[in-house]
């Protein structure tokens, strides 16, 4: 496999993020706000540190995003019983509608991305992505272990 494949994968990832950001803008959200809302739906009841790591952003950046979404009434912060300094994030009832529309927008984006792929190709592609994720995690393990 050539380095060209790696470049193509990186370029596709960048294009996907750009399209995602454009589509969620139509819902009145920034890309980071939308990613946080989707993460809150997928991984509920975690603290802000978890979401900052998941979204690969600095905690202070996440705090700004959380502040805006909290002001809009879409999320709420609660004290973490295990750590009084930490805050657990939750979606609010008000956010359910926007999250549903957001998920539909993302699903449409993925359909556009996979246009022309039949169901067998989509299944193979999904398995390949899982293997890539496993390989990347394994490659990172020595880094994590040795700091």
Q: Which positions does each model-derived feature cover?
A:
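N-terminal leader segment of winged-helix/HTH proteins
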Residues: 1-27, 93, 143-147
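Short alpha-helical elements of helix-turn-helix
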Residues: 3-7, 27-38, 63
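Pre-recognition alpha-helix immediately N-terminal to the DNA-recognition helix
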Residues: 8, 15, 19, 35-38, ...
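Charged, amphipathic alpha-helical coiled-coil/dimerization segments
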Residues: 17, 45, 49, 67-130, ...
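Short helix-capping/turn signature of helix-turn-helix
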Residues: 40-43, 57, 132
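The alpha-helix within a helix-turn-helix
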Residues: 52
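Key DNA-contact positions within bacterial/archaeal DNA-binding proteins
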Residues: 60
């Amino acid at each position: 496999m050539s380095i060209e494949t790696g470049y193509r994968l990186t370029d596709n990832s960048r294009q996907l993020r750009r399209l995602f950001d454009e589509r969620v803008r139509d819902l009145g959200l920034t890309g980071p706000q939308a990613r946080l809302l989707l993460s809150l739906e997928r991984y509920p009841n975690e603290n802000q540190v978890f979401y900052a790591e998941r979204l690969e952003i600095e905690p202070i950046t996440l705090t700004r995003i959380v502040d805006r979404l909290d002001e809009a009434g879409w999320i709420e912060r609660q004290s973490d019983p295990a750590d009084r300094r930490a805050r657990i994030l939750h979606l609010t009832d008000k956010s359910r509608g926007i999250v549903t529309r957001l998920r539909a927008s993302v699903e449409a984006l993925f359909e556009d991305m996979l246009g022309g792929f039949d169901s067998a190709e989509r299944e193979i592609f999904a398995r390949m992505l899982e293997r890539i994720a496993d390989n990347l995690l394994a490659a990172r393990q020595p880094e994590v272990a040795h700091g």
